[in-house]
């Protein structure tokens, strides 16, 4: 189980100040992150180190990350709100 301290920290790191990112990342960290395996948790934390403008392009599907694993996490987050 994910510790409350870790979830709170990730919650605040997921709040990017850009509404388009906040509406995707904040619910994901609250509802999905606790159920991810360790590899995907690490991947989500790595995603949070990316620049907001890069993430915006990926989530708006204007571009794809050159990192296939990061793109997989982007897809996982998008599939939560718009299943294919």
UniProtKB/Swiss-Prot annotation:
Q: State where the protein is found.
A: Cytoplasm
Primary location:
cytoplasm
Top-level taxon of the source organism = Bacteria
Key words of the record? Chaperone, Cytoplasm
| Any one GO biological process | succinate metabolic process
Any one Pfam family here would be Sdh5
- Which GO cellular component terms, listed alphabetically, does the Swiss-Prot or TrEMBL entry include? cytoplasm
Gene3D superfamilies according to UniProt: Flavinator of succinate dehydrogenase (1.10.150.250)
Claim: Cytoplasm is one of the keywords in the record: yes
* Coiled-coil regions listed: none
Which Cys pairs does UniProt list as disulfide-bonded? Answer: none
Question: To which protein family does this belong?
Answer: Belongs to the SdhE FAD assembly factor family.
Q: What does this protein do?
A: An FAD assembly protein, which accelerates covalent attachment of the cofactor into other proteins. Plays an essential role in the assembly of succinate dehydrogenase (SDH, respiratory complex II), an enzyme complex that is a component of both the tricarboxylic acid cycle and the electron transport chain, and which couples the oxidation of succinate to fumarate with the reduction of ubiquinone (coenzyme Q) to ubiquinol. Required for flavinylation (covalent attachment of FAD) of the flavoprotein subunit SdhA of SDH and other flavinylated proteins as well.
Q: What is this protein called?
A: FAD assembly factor SdhE
User: What taxonomic ancestry is recorded?
Assistant: Bacteria, Pseudomonadati, Pseudomonadota, Gammaproteobacteria, Pseudomonadales
